[in-house]
Curated annotation (Swiss-Prot):
GO terms for cellular component: cytosol; cytosolic small ribosomal subunit. Disruption phenotype: Non-essential gene, increased formation of inactive 100S ribosomes in stationary phase, which persist longer than in wild-type. Double hpr-yfiA deletion mutants form 90S ribosomes. A quadruple yfiA-hpf-rmf-sra knockout strain is significantly outcompeted by wild-type after 4 days growth. No visible effect on viability or growth rate at 37 or 10 degrees Celsius, slight effect on bulk translation and timing of expression of some cold-shock proteins. The keyword Signal does not apply. Residues 23-26, 83-91 are annotated as: Interaction with 16S rRNA. This is Ribosome-associated inhibitor A. Residues 91-113 are annotated as: Disordered. It comes from the Bacteria. During stationary phase prevents 70S dimer formation, probably in order to regulate translation efficiency during transition between the exponential and the stationary phases. During environmental stress such as cold shock or excessive cell density at stationary phase, stabilizes the 70S ribosome against dissociation, inhibits translation elongation and increases translation accuracy. When normal growth conditions are restored, is quickly released from the ribosome. Has been suggested to inhibit translation elongation by blocking the A-site (aminoacyl-tRNA site). It comes from Escherichia coli (strain K12). It holds the Pfam family Ribosomal_S30AE. InterPro entries: HPF/YfiA_ribosome-assoc, RHF-like, RHF/RaiA.
Length: 113
């Protein structure tokens, strides 16, 4: 998977690049094609910020993670992306209702007659 990693006010080390790649590989368990992931890593006075924009066939995932430690900010970012992917994958199942309350009452009335 190809990914773009951009940094602002800091240098990307091979260790950071490898950590991002390893954590993004965790998202592959959802069996969704990740189209052109773009990760932005920046250093701010309060700590580090990791932002991501990832296109998928079902929509766009956008998340941000902030922490004093760069690796923890990346982990927060990936956890947020994983929750979004889970929600996106199960969206159709959540909207599918077995029967509504009206239909259930109607079935009971028919049986009583």
């Amino acid at each position: 998977m190809t990914m773009n990693i951009t940094s602002k006010q800091m240098e990307i080390t091979p260790a950071i690049r490898q950590h991002v790649a390893d954590r993004l590989a965790k998202l592959e368990k959802w069996q969704t094609h990740l189209i052109n992931p773009h990760i932005i890593l920046s250093k701010e006075p309060q700590g580090f910020v990791a932002d991501a924009t990832i296109n998928t066939p079902n929509g766009v995932l956008v998340a941000s993670g902030k922490h004093e430690d760069m690796y923890t900010a990346i982990n927060e970012l990936i956890n947020k992306l994983e929750r979004q992917l889970n929600k996106l994958q199960h969206k159709g199942e959540a909207r599918r209702a077995a029967t509504s309350v009206k239909d259930a009452n109607f079935v009971e009335e028919v049986e009583e007659e």
